[in-house]
C-alpha cells in the first residue's frame, strides 16, 4: 500500500506538491478551510480533511490542527509548501515530535535562517562576504548611533521581515526617523518584535539567488542561479534562470558560497541562498529555507523536479 503525505497548504503550491507526489505513487491528503472546499487542491487530492475554524490562524496556521489531521488520516509525512507554516521552526519540530517526516529543513535550520542577523553571522563565519550590519536594537537613539557608524544610505530592517515588509530605506539622516518608525512598527505588528537593525545599502546591486538542495549530512549541491532584480516594492516581479551577464568567476563564486554555507548548516531539503551582486562583487543577503514560488523556472532550465527531490530526501 502506498504511503500517505499531507500537504499543509492550499492553492498553486498544494496542487504542485500533489502532482509530484502522485508521480511517485504517494497518496495525497489535502487540508482545507470551509471556504476552500471546492478548490483545485481538494479535487486533486486522494483524500481531504476539513480544518474547522475561521481564517488562517485557526486553519492553515494551526499547528495542532494540521498534525491532528495528519494523524487522523494515517499520513507518514507533511509537506508545508511555502507560506503559512513552511518556515516555522516550531511547526517542523512539532511534526517530528509527532513521529512524522517534515519535508523541509530541520527545525534548527529554520530557526537560524528565520533571523536575518543570526543568518548573516553564520554566513560570515562560513567565510561568505557580507554587508555592513549592526546588532539588533529597539530604540531610535540606538538607531541613530548605529547609522552614524555605518553611514548613509542604509536600510532599517526587521530581522524577521520578508516579502518587502519590515524593511525601509533611509538615503540620508533626515529620513532615518521615518525609516525606523515604519520598520519597527511593521516588525511589531507582523512578527511580534519591534527590534530592528541597520544594513548597508548597495544602490546599483542586482538580486541573484542560488538554488540549493541538501541531504542533511552536509552534502549540498546547487541547481544554478536565478535573477530576480526586477522588483516592485522590494517584491520580485520577474525571475530568469540562469542569471545572465555574470562572468565565470562571479557565477562560480556564487555557487561555491551557497554550497559552503548550506553545507555548514547541514541543509536538508531545498533552500535558496540570496545575494546582492554589483559588478564582480557579491554579498550574502539571506536564506529562504523552503521551496520557492519561482522554483519552476529552475526546473524548466535544468530538467529536474525539485519537489520530487524533496520527497526523495525526506522519505
Describe the function of each predicted region.
Residues 164-166:
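A short acidic, helix-capping loop that chelates divalent metal ions and anchors anionic groups
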Residues 133-134:
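Conserved beta3 strand of the protein kinase N-lobe
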Residues 6-24, 28, 47-50, 71-73, ...:
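ATP-dependent carboxylate activation and anion-phosphoryl transfer catalytic cores
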Residues 1-126, 138-145:
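ATP-binding N-terminal substructure of ATP-dependent carboxylate-amine bond-forming enzymes
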Residues 145-156:
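Acidic/histidine-enriched active-site and ligand-binding environments that engage anionic O-linkages
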Amino acid at each position: 500500500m502506498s504511503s500517505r503525505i499531507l500537504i499543509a497548504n492550499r492553492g498553486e503550491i498544494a496542487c504542485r506538491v500533489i502532482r509530484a507526489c502522485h508521480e511517485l505513487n504517494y497518496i495525497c491528503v489535502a487540508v482545507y478551510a470551509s471556504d476552500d472546499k471546492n478548490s483545485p487542491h481538494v479535487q486533486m487530492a486522494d483524500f481531504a480533511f476539513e480544518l474547522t475554524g475561521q481564517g488562517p490562524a485557526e486553519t492553515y496556521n494551526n499547528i495542532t490542527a494540521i498534525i491532528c489531521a495528519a494523524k487522523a488520516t494515517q499520513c507518514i509525512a507533511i509537506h508545508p509548501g511555502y507560506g503559512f507554516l513552511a518556515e516555522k521552526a516550531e511547526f517542523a519540530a512539532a511534526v517530528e515530535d509527532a513521529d512524522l517526516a517534515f519535508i523541509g529543513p530541520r527545525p534548527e535550520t529554520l530557526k537560524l535562517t528565520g533571523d536575518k542577523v543570526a543568518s548573516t553571522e553564520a554566513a560570515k563565519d562560513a567565510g561568505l562576504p557580507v554587508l555592513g550590519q549592526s546588532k539588533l536594537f529597539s530604540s531610535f537613539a540606538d538607531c541613530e548611533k548605529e547609522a552614524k557608524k555605518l553611514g548613509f544610505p542604509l536600510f532599517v530592517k526587521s530581522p524577521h521581515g520578508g516579502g518587502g515588509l519590515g524593511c525601509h530605506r533611509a538615503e540620508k539622516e533626515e529620513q532615518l526617523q521615518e525609516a525606523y518608525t515604519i520598520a519597527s512598527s511593521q516588525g511589531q505588528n507582523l512578527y511580534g518584535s519591534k527590534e530592528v537593525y541597520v544594513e548597508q545599502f548597495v544602490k546599483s546591486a542586482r538580486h541573484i539567488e542560488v538554488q540549493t538542495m541538501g541531504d542533511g549530512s552536509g552534502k549540498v549541491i546547487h541547481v544554478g542561479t536565478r535573477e530576480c532584480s526586477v522588483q516592485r516594492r522590494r517584491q520580485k516581479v520577474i525571475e530568469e534562470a540562469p542569471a545572465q551577464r555574470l562572468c565565470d568567476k562571479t557565477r562560480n563564486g556564487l555557487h561555491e558560497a551557497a554550497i559552503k554555507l548550506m553545507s555548514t548548516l547541514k541543509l536538508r531539503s531545498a533552500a535558496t541562498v540570496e545575494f546582492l551582486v554589483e559588478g564582480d562583487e557579491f554579498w550574502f543577503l539571506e536564506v529562504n529555507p523552503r521551496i520557492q514560488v519561482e522554483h519552476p523556472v529552475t526546473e524548466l532550465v535544468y530538467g529536474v523536479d525539485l519537489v520530487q527531490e524533496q520527497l526523495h530526501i525526506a522519505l
